[in-house]
Structures are given as C-alpha cells and as structure tokens.
C-alpha cells in the first residue's frame, strides 16, 4: 500500500507540473506584449517559444501566402484565445504574426487581411 501511495504521489507531481493548453494560450498572450515591429523571426520565436503541449504546436502552423504586392509573406499562427468548448482549434483562436524578409511587420487578422487581401480563413459562425 505504501508503494501505491508513492506512485500516486509521483504521478501527481509529474502531471501537476505539466503545462496545459490554457497555460500556453496565456503565455502566448503575455509574450505578445514583448514583441515589436522589426524584430527578426528568430527573435520572435525566442520570445513566443516553439514547444508542443498536449499535441498543440507552438507556433500552431506556418504559411507563406502571396501578398497584394506579389511578395511572399511568412505567417506564424499562435494559439492565443479560446472561443468554444472542445479540442478543435479554429482560426478565430489564433493570432497571425506576419513577416516579410525575415522581419516582423505586423500581427493580427486585420493586418494580415491588409497585406494578403485574398487570404482565406475560417471563422466559425454561431
């Protein structure tokens, strides 16, 4: 019985200290405040992180859409919000970070739609 108690305690310590997706979202929102325009992609990745928690990658995804000026942009999407219950992460729960020539030029859906007007993203309609 004593061994069982020790095993339960060890499991509690291991899983009690594990990061959750909610902690990841909170950390991403806090780290967002540390960013500034002109930072390199490397600097942003250092601040925002690149870990995977509960099968959620950070950044969640990376895309390279073509902008209205014909240039290719690199967009890193970070999980920052929770809009609905469940495990499915929707675009409305992500914040896009937009890079041109390895330099952060802006973030947010409004900014992305300015530089890539035809970008197709899915916002769930209620």
Region annotations inferred by a language model:
Residues 1-17:
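Sec-dependent bacterial lipoprotein signal peptides
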Residues 18-126:
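Residues within mature, well-folded domains
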